[in-house]
Amino acid sequence: MENFHAQYVMLETIGHGGCSKVMLARHRLTGSHVAVKMIRKSECWCNPVMSEVELLMMADHPNIISLLQVIETKKKVYLIMELCEGKSLYQHIRNAGYLQEDEARALFKQLLSAMNYCHNQGIVHRDLKPDNIMVEKDGKVKIIDFGLGTQVKPGQKLNLFCGTYPFSAPEVLLSRPYDGPKIDVWTLGVVLYFMVTGKVPFDAASIQKLVRQILAGKYFVPSRLSVELRDLISLLMTANPKLRPTVAEVMVHPWVTEGSGVFPDPCEEQMPLKPNPAIVKAMGYIGFQAQDIEDSLRQRKFNETMASYCLLKKQILKECDRPIRAQPMNPSVTPFPSLVDTSTFHLGLRRRETEPTSLRLSANRQMSVCGRSTSKKRDRRFSWPSVSGRPLHTTHTMDHTHTRTRSVPCIYSMFCTIQPNSSDDSTEGHTSASAEDKPVRSRGWPRGIKGWTRKIGNVMRKLCCCIPSKETSHVGHSRVSPKK
């Protein structure tokens, strides 16, 4: 069984919920930061149809958060995920007030691509909202939370009534068996409305009034929006789910296809059958076997080998995208082995005889993961009430916003009330991030395989992005009704 603390250094807690905690951690071999969701087996009372980890194992799309590794112990399950560099769509819109149609279209097309991929895989999200969508600094979108997701067969009806009230489709609030993909389409409509107005279409002082608004299907839309956009919003939020379009049909709507630009390629980040020889060779110097690397990627084992390869590949791709300057090396930081400089090969072999336990977790994850700042200073952030699988209730949270430097963050629970961060387990393998613990930075990208692999150890870095939030008032609304 793999040892978590032998592979990762815990830095700080960035989210906490009823049966799980999200930590910021550093991968020891590469220095990369990751988000780690720790789930206590004894506290997992939630029981969805399919667990979040199983859905993430199935998903491989450039606009869906990547699961890198799963480590299971007797008491806990560790989900190691990529850490996005950006902030939530909610924060992004709060900073801007609302988005212009061109920017909204660019982001929305990525959401459509991801959700079309999910629906083709039989995956239903059921909790799409701006908090669960990350926007990276380059404008790339990542859907990060599948805690309420499940897998369905064509024509299968669902009866677990969950989600977030302002984004819930009428059929969910009526407690009727529903078509999973169609409620995702409704939610996409609410998200699109929020993107171009800065507000949700349905808002009320109480849950009862909010439910009545949604069931009545009456909402306001700014008169400044184009005719095509208003038509698309109306289609997405069609009250009758049978008349609501599929995601594939939405992708050919005139507003979506307007202008240049293509949809993200679902194959963009799929694992190659053959790993990069340079990375394999570099990993071989610290005990990884080439055949094990290839098998781990091809079979998507989500083990130490797969995580190490993916993190190294991401570092190299990031390094290719921007020039960097050299900095003095921290003597306390061990450089990653280079194929050229054999003096760096004083690392012990990382391989152990045992491989990670094969894992198919029971369906019991109900915690959402959203972006959260690792900085000490935070703004206030707003959270919408949720629809529970139990009797409907409101999850009370404070109205606050917060900037993020890298992404996975706060935990929302549709079933568990959010709890303040506790010290329990926070010291388990915990190591505070030191200001002196800075990676090596090189002058440029050398040519050739040897130069390429030499860069592997010099690409660790820390990013910081602090953007103040502001609100903008909006006027000029006209009442419309969704198509019946």
Curated annotation (Swiss-Prot):
SUPFAM superfamilies listed in its UniProt record: Protein kinase-like (PK-like)
Region (Disordered): 356-400, 422-450
Catalysed reactions, semicolon-separated: L-seryl-[protein] + ATP = O-phospho-L-seryl-[protein] + ADP + H(+); L-threonyl-[protein] + ATP = O-phospho-L-threonyl-[protein] + ADP + H(+)
Domain of life: Eukaryota
GO molecular function: ATP binding; protein kinase activity; protein serine kinase activity; protein serine/threonine kinase activity
Domain Protein kinase: residue ranges: 8-256
Transmembrane stretches, start-end: none
Note in the entry: Encoded on the T-complex, a region of 20-30 Mb on proximal third of mouse chromosome 17. Naturally occurring variant forms of the T-complex, known as complete t-haplotypes, are found in wild mouse populations. The t-haplotypes contain at least four nonoverlapping inversions that suppress recombination with the wild-type chromosome, and lock into strong linkage disequilibrium loci affecting normal transmission of the chromosome, male gametogenesis and embryonic development.
Protein name: Sperm motility kinase 2B
Gene name for this UniProt entry: Smok2b
